[in-house]
Amino acid sequence: MPKTTMPDRFWTKVDTSGECWIWLAHIDAQGYGRFGQEYAHRFSYELHRGMRPIPTGHQIDHICHNRACVNPKHLRAVTNKQNGENRKGPNRNSTSGVRGVTWNKRHQKWCAKFRHNGAYIYVGMFDSLNEAEKRVIARRNQVFTCNTKDRRKRKV
């Protein structure tokens, strides 16, 4: 009886019916699929590139923000900084619900700023949350290279 290959075993654990290819086997506490001792998305990335290893100093970014997705079209090798640029949204403790926008009590305005290379980039103070959001997104798009979420058309 022929031995089952790693790719054959991998494909029995993937649902390819949607845009995101969902890992059906073990999912860890952080939401990532596990394939033996390896992350499923990392195995998928390497498998679809002829088993070439992920470049040194890089990690795999889920462009779709779905940690269980193993679709190679949704995966890219990026640096830690680039992966941080493509964050899904605001911090858990955000009071505005908008990434990079906070309420300034002293000035009674929305303050838009974000971090880049260890320093804050100040965008401005705004009367409306909507205007602050538009301006911080526009400025991040000028500075960041891997923030696909900001570059998608916003639904109004």
Give the location of each predicted region:
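J-domain helical core
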Residues: 129-140
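Glycine-centered flexibility sites
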Residues: 18, 25, 31-33, 97-100, ...
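A short, exposed loop/beta-hairpin motif centered on an aromatic-Gly-Thr core
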Residues: 119-130
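Extended, polar beta-sheet/loop recognition surfaces of beta-rich domains
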Residues: 81-82, 142-156
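Short helix-coil boundary/hinge micro-motifs
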Residues: 1-36, 64-65
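Short, cationic Gly/His-enriched loop motifs
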Residues: 36-118, 137
